[in-house]
Structures are given as C-alpha cells and as structure tokens.
Amino acid sequence: MAFTVLSDENVKQLFQGFGPEDVAFASDVLTAAFLSYSVGQEAQYQPHRAAVVRPNGQTGLFMPATTEDGMSVKIVGLPPPSSGSTDLRCVLTVCDGTGKAVGIINAEELTAFRTSLGSILLYRYRKRTENIVVFGAGKQALWHLRLALVLRGSDIANITIVNRSQERAFKLMERLRAMDRASGVGGTDMVSFTVIEATPDSAPGNDLLRSVVEKSDVIFCTTPSTQRLFPAEWLTSERASAKSRYISAIGSYKLNMKEIDPDFLRAVIDTPLGTFSSAHGGKKDGIIFVDSREACFLEAGELVDAKIPAEKITEIGEFTDSLRKADEAEAELLRDWLENGLIVYKSVGIGIMDLSLGKVILELAAKHNIGTKLPDF
C-alpha cells in the first residue's frame, strides 16, 4: 500500500455515506480491538498516553498503540481554557508491523467517530430509544447522534440537544440533516429536535432540562466539563428511577473533569437502582462499563471521585468475551440486561481504538481512491 495522506475533508467524505452495514463492520473491528486489549495479550503492549500542559493551558496528548501487525501514534492538541474553544486538533500516524509508515490521517473526525462507536457498541442492544438527550454540540455529539440514527432511526422520536450555545446546536442539527440527505440513511425528518441552552451552573434550576432527563431513554454526555452536568437526584428520584436508560459519558479525560454526578455512580453500584432482575429469572448487580479500567482509574474524574472499586467496573472487551462464552441461559440474561437494564458506559479513549479504525479508513481510502498517495515516502 502506498503511503496515504487523508485530509479532514477526505475523512468526512469516507464517513459521509456510512450506512448500517458499514457501521456494523466498523463495530466488529472495534469489538475485536477491545477483546484483544481486555482478554488477549495486547494490554501489556500498550504504552499509556502522555499529557503535557503548557503554561498558557494548552494541552498536548500523545497516544501510542501497537498490535501484531501495526503501530500508531496520535497527537491531540486541546486549546487553553482562556480561548473559549473546545475544538481539538489531532493527527494519526499509522505504521505496519515493521514500523514502516503507511499513512497519516487528520484525525479530528476519526477521533469523534471511534469514541462514539465505542458508546454505540452497547447502545445498539437497547429496546427503548425513543427519547435521546445529548449534552454538547461538537463532533462527539454529532457522531453519537449520527450513529444512533443510522442504526435505530425508526425507533427515535425525540432528540434534545443541551448546550451553552443554541447557535452551535442548530449547526449540529443541520449537519445531521445534510448527512442524512447525502446517504439516504438516518430518518432525521421523522425526529423532533429540541435545543435547551444550559450550563452546569444553570442546570439545577432548569425545570425543562430536568423533565427531559427524567423522561430520557438514552443520555449521551460529550462535554469536557469540570462540573457535573446535572444533579444525581434527577436520575435517582422515585419518578426518574421508575424507568431504565442507557448513559454514556466520554467527554471528561482528566481527574478534575466530570460529567456524571459521582453520587449517581455510587447509587448504581450501591443501591437497587442499578440492579437488574430479568423477567425470565436471573439477576445482575449494578456495574460501570468502561473501555479501559486502568485508563479510567488514571483519568476519569467522576469514577475516581465516586471511589468505584475495580470489581464494580467491567471493560467492554471483558463483557463481550463473557457474552460470547456464556451458556444459553446466561447469554439470554446478559442480552436482556443490555436491552432493558440501567447501563452506564464511561470512556476516556485508548490508542488501540485509533489504530484499529485508522487501518480501516486507510483501506477504504485505497478502495475508493481517496486521499493523496506518496509511493516513494
């Protein structure tokens, strides 16, 4: 394969036409990566990412990864808090198993896609997904909603976007509709969109926001917040706990950050809130799903603040392996839990996600003759 350079527009072009079959294929690739990390031998060969914070608050993240047949390094630039921007800049270099570089990818869109796909791996099982609430209006919010619409568009009736800026939320809605038109998949014309302008400071007194959170079937948290996005009580009250939901939180990546109230996480593992009893018999205690237990203990502020013990945390690769190996009765219970139980997923991202999906994107680019080729690199 010739060395390939993919710009941001190239990557968007490749993703634009993704339909259910493409998402299913990418899901299988990411699932295999999680399995190799959690129950294979790959975890020991993954250097942990490094973060450097400059005096002005500019942050650089360096995320290496290796597998038997590849290596990669992603560099992420995060603006200082004083800039007022949450947009990140990132680039992924992909090598083969010998270390020969095979491609370089503008990874802004890819990062949002791979993180969102991690959330969707568990979401796709859900029986009820009528009411979705997403916190944030950036690329992560876009791809969480886009993937949900591609896979479950006919089952989604209401999407509420919660953001400090209405303008950005409306731009998100427009891009979702444009992607729908370009691919013919998504069903945005059948969905009712609502925008709520709110911040973590203003949320506690916002009755409308509380109402949509309590009625939600799915909550996607996609913001780099240093405060809880809403109080735990909104999910632990008698009215809110009468229904189950799927919740993912992917925005916080430092110990001083948190999206989900730590009190809610404690309630999931310490109270009947997280307990699932199947109508067919069988019971599961509340746990927190993660991409990497080690990475989350180092970087997930809400998990650390909640003091969630290791035995109450399950990696998605571990769970997938358990489901794959379970006997018929246990497998039925696990699937019922995923479909109807309270499922909470926390991700900080790991390099093997970038490497596995980066290789897929390079292969798709070669197939469709997209990008710039450098045969003599």
Outline where the language-model segments fall:
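Rossmann-fold NAD(P) dinucleotide-binding segment
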Residues: N206, R210-S211, K215-V218, T226-R245
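Phosphate-binding loop/pocket of nucleotide- and phosphate-handling active sites
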Residues: S356-F377
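Glycine-rich adenosine-cofactor-binding loop
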Residues: S119, R128-R152, I156-R168
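NAD(P)-binding Rossmann-fold cofactor-contacting core
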Residues: G153-T199
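Structural motif
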Residues: G103, N131, D217-V218, Y246
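N-terminal ligand-binding/catalytic initiation module
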Residues: M1-L122, L355, D376
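Rossmann-fold NAD(P)-binding glycine/threonine-rich loop
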Residues: W234-L235, A240-W337, I361
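Short glycine-/small-residue-rich Rossmann-like dinucleotide-binding loops
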Residues: T223-S225, G251-S252
